[in-house]
UniProtKB/Swiss-Prot annotation:
Cellular component terms per the entry's GO annotation: DUBm complex; nucleus; SAGA complex
GO biological-process terms attached to the record: axon target recognition; chromatin organization; glial cell development; glial cell migration; positive regulation of DNA-templated transcription; protein deubiquitination; regulation of DNA-templated transcription; ubiquitin-dependent protein catabolic process
Gene Ontology molecular function: any one: cysteine-type deubiquitinase activity
Reaction equation(s) it catalyzes: Thiol-dependent hydrolysis of ester, thioester, amide, peptide and isopeptide bonds formed by the C-terminal Gly of ubiquitin (a 76-residue protein attached to proteins as an intracellular targeting signal)
Protein name: Ubiquitin carboxyl-terminal hydrolase nonstop
Sites where the protein binds Zn(2+) 3: 59, 62, 75, 81
USP domain location: 158-491
């Protein structure tokens, strides 16, 4: 790999120098002064369709602006021009390579322009160019050719050894490893433990597991270290008897959440120790699940907000409370109202979950509006949704009379819209469509059985994970399965 990373850009610079890049970056990407900002607002639009906004490109060979996709691509192809500048972030694109490219000299000029922009706006610079380390440079030199993961490749698929009734753990790990946002986080090496005893950190162990899954090896993995860590931090799961997969899932999220918060607190404590000496004590917050106060990767992906509205039947006064959730547990048994109907689909379950429930005379509560004890109704709705929604179908029923497993078939969709279940349906902002990517199943009775999982490996490829055995599966097999835990990923992510 050359210093520029692209021989086409190297040829361009020899012929045209950096002058055009410096001008376009200064006036249409960085906008170094007020005149540049006004010029961009007036003239920076696609020459073909006239669109403004993000994802506009400027051809560095001639005076042409085109939007991402057909227009800039058509221009570069027809004119036999190779290099364009993306104007939102100032990144170089080579049409011949079909990729964004890096050039050290261009980055130096771009940084100068960003400093001028920051000075003109009287703000700190919020953009820093990527400068590869020696290690990264060597990796790039050794891997100059791009590697494509094709649909028929099995990278990311690993069987998991059953250590003695640990199928409940294996299927949850398969679901977590195939959670796209979680995979992006751990595969980009975002976790920095900062602890002297990283061998006790569950986040470090999960990070190592992700690396193992995507190492290219096909031999089954042993999760003995993960199991040991869970036993140490969730004592109720310790032992070799069969455990509940849902309980293990929630316990794993809780321990990961606590360890993420602890790692952050230790970093802050180290930085504060060199200042005023007043360290940060987060021992209490590390064990709490505080929605809106924690930005760890677990809460960013899995935490949503449940809204509960209690309506007084006397004065119609409404008392609203909010609670964070990591999953939604749905009843499958017969209802005591509506003719004792049992749900047939996931939508039926959600409709029953969000239906107003009359609390009755035996459960009167004091109304904060009329200041008296009155009968009331209670209704759940979803205030906010996480990036990943996990549904727990409550198939194991425990009562004073009988313990049983509900094996009735519940139809669940590949994709569906959660808007009808939001607290503010009419004013709900955003896209609430979700796609199925993992299903955990239980085969057997309430006393004994076996867990397996279906996971989406590629866009249209599903596999069945049965401990150390991984086999291809059809979508029909997935949708025909019983379903115990259902994992859905949001189709469109909003970034703040």
């Amino acid at each position: 790999m050359s210093e520029t990373g692209c021989r086409h850009y190297q040829s361009y610079v020899k012929e045209h120098s950096y002058d055009t890049f410096r001008v376009i970056d200064a006036y249409f990407a960085a906008c170094v002064n007020r005149d540049a900002r006004e010029r961009k607002a007036i003239h920076c639009n696609c020459f073909e369709c006239g669109s403004y906004g993000i994802q506009l490109y400027a051809c560095l060979h001639c005076i042409y602006f085109g939007c991402r996709g057909a227009h800039i691509t058509s221009h570069l192809r027809s004119k036999k021009h190779n290099v364009a500048l993306e104007l939102s972030h100032g990144t170089l694109y080579c049409y011949a390579c079909r990729d964004f490219i890096y050039d050290a000299r261009s980055r130096e000029y771009a940084l100068i322009n960003r400093k001028l922009e920051a000075k003109d706006l009287q703000k700190s610079i919020g953009w820093v160019p990527w400068v590869p380390t020696t290690k990264e440079t060597n990796l790039l030199l050794a891997n100059a050719r791009r590697r494509l993961v094709r649909p028929n490749q099995t990278i990311g698929l690993r069987g998991l050894l059953n250590l003695g009734a640990t199928c409940f753990m294996n299927c949850i790990v398969q679901a977590l490893v195939h959670t796209p946002l979680l995979s992006d986080y751990f595969m980009s090496d975002r976790h920095d433990c900062g602890s002297k005893s990283s061998h006790k950190c569950l986040v470090c162990e999960v990070s190592r597991l992700f690396q193992e899954f995507y190492s290219g090896s096909r031999s089954p993995l042993s999760l003995h270290r993960l199991l040991h860590l869970i036993w140490n931090h969730a004592k109720h799961l310790a032992g070799y008897e069969q455990q509940d997969a849902h309980e293990f899932f929630i316990a794993t999220l809780d321990v990961l959440h606590r360890h993420c918060v602890k790692a952050k607190a230790e970093h802050e404590s180290k930085s504060n120790s060199s200042g005023s000496g007043s360290g940060t004590n987060s021992s209490n917050s590390s064990s709490s699940h505080c929605y809106g106060q924690c930005n760890c990767i677990i809460d960013q992906i899995f935490t949503g907000m449940l809204q509960s509205d209690v309506v007084c039947q006397a004065c119609n006064g409404v008392s609203t409370t909010y609670d964070p959730f990591w999953d939604i547990s749905l009843d499958l048994g017969e209802t005591t109202t509506h003719g004792g109907v049992t749900p047939k689909t996931l939508i039926d379950c959600l409709e029953r979950y969000t239906r107003a429930e009359h609390l009755g005379s035996a459960a009167k509560i004091k109304c904060s509006t009329c200041k008296s004890y009155q009968e009331s109704t209670k209704q759940f709705s979803l205030r906010t949704l996480p990036s990943v929604v996990s549904f727990h179908l409550k198939r194991f029923e425990h009562s004073a009379l009988i313990d049983r497993k509900i094996s009735s078939f519940i139809q669940f969709p590949v994709e569906f819209d959660m808007t009808p279940f939001m607290s503010e349906k009419k004013n709900a902002y955003g896209d609430f469509r979700f796609s199925l990517y993992a299903v955990v199943n239980h085969v057997g009775t309430i006393d004994t059985g076996h867990y397996t999982a279906y996971v989406r490996h590629q866009k249209d490829t599903w596999v069945k994970c049965d401990d150390h055995v991984i086999t291809m599966a059809s979508l029909k097999q997935v949708l025909d399965s019983e379903g115990y835990l259902l994992f859905y990923h949001k189709n469109v992510l909003e970034y703040e």
